[in-house]
Amino acid sequence: MKPKEIDKADIEILMDVDFLVSVIVAIGEVANITGVPQRKIRYWDEKGIIEPVDKTSTYRQYNYLNIKKVVLVQELLDEGFTLDAAAKKVNERYTKVAEVFKRVSALKDHQKK
């Protein structure tokens, strides 16, 4: 059976950068989504591995990219990496992901014109 081709509309839905960038989730939900305990998320926040959206607020809320960082760091820890090594590897990958987000966003802006 031949796999179904993904049409342009499906790709736009999957790559809705504007939506992904606007997603902001409280620490409890991040813990529920990722399976990583809040205490561990707070520790990673204190170490600078992830950053809340508003550093001045007493409420810890995170955007999509930071939620993704939590998932990736935990996966690397599960594979046996140290926290520092996992954070370094994720930050390198995060830089690449951020560049892709910028390019996709720029392409979407260009298409609107």
Across the structure, where does each feature detected by a protein language model lie?
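Arginine residue identity/basic-tract feature
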Residues: R39-R42, R60, R93, R103
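Arg/Lys-rich, alpha-helical DNA-contact motif
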Residues: M1-N32, E51-P52, Y64-K113
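Minor-groove-contacting beta-hairpin "wing" of winged helix-turn-helix DNA-binding domains
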Residues: T58-Y64
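Major-groove DNA-recognition helix of helix-turn-helix-type DNA-binding domains
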Residues: V36-T58, F81
